[in-house]
From Swiss-Prot:
The organism of origin for this protein: Frankia alni
Quaternary structure (record): Homotrimer; associates with NifD.
Name of the molecule in the record: Nitrogenase-stabilizing/protective protein NifW
Region Disordered, residue ranges: 106-132
Compositional bias segments (type: Polar residues): 109-123
GO process annotations (BP): nitrogen fixation
Function noted in UniProt: May protect the nitrogenase Fe-Mo protein from oxidative damage.
InterPro entries, per the entry: NifW (IPR004893)
Entry-linked Pfam families: NifW
Homology family: Belongs to the NifW family.
Keywords from the named record: Nitrogen fixation
Domain of life: Bacteria
Length: 132
């Protein structure tokens, strides 16, 4: 590819508005069924990957390198949802809020058994018996 083609492809990347457009432009093979089910999740993950690239100081001067980094980010985002589901990643607030909470833990040393009809001894009566 020439530099002009790379620059044009980068300009086209900035005009993409659908997941399929990103996949086609960056020449990433994909299963349309996976994209149909996970479209928003893949795009959200991809946006996060692009933000990481920007924070890491991606080579914005060289369109070819930038497009390669974008392609790698899209592949990672797509593979994240071919290997696991949306509930595993919980990218959106509605899914984060519905995340399973860890069960409260009660150690066995804290469990006491009381027979029906018997009264639970109080601390003062136990101390009294110990003093005798």
């Amino acid at each position: 590819m020439s530099a002009t083609t790379d620059a044009g492809q980068l300009a086209e990347f900035n005009r993409c508005s659908t997941a399929e457009q990103y996949f086609d432009l960056l020449e990433v093979d994909y299963d349309p069924r996976v994209v149909a089910v996970n479209r928003l999740h893949i795009l959200k993950h991809f946006a996060g990957e692009l933000a990481k690239l920007q924070d890491a100081g991606a080579d914005t001067e060289n369109p070819r390198h930038l497009l390669r980094d974008y392609r790698d980010a899209l592949v990672r985002s797509y593979e994240a949802f071919t290997n696991a589901g949306a509930l595993d990643h919980r990218l959106f607030k509605v899914l984060k809020d519905r995340a399973p909470q860890a069960a409260d833990f009660v150690p066995t040393s804290e469990i006491t058994v009381q027979r029906p009809g018997s009264t639970q001894p109080s601390e003062t009566s136990e101390r009294t018996e110990e003093a005798r």
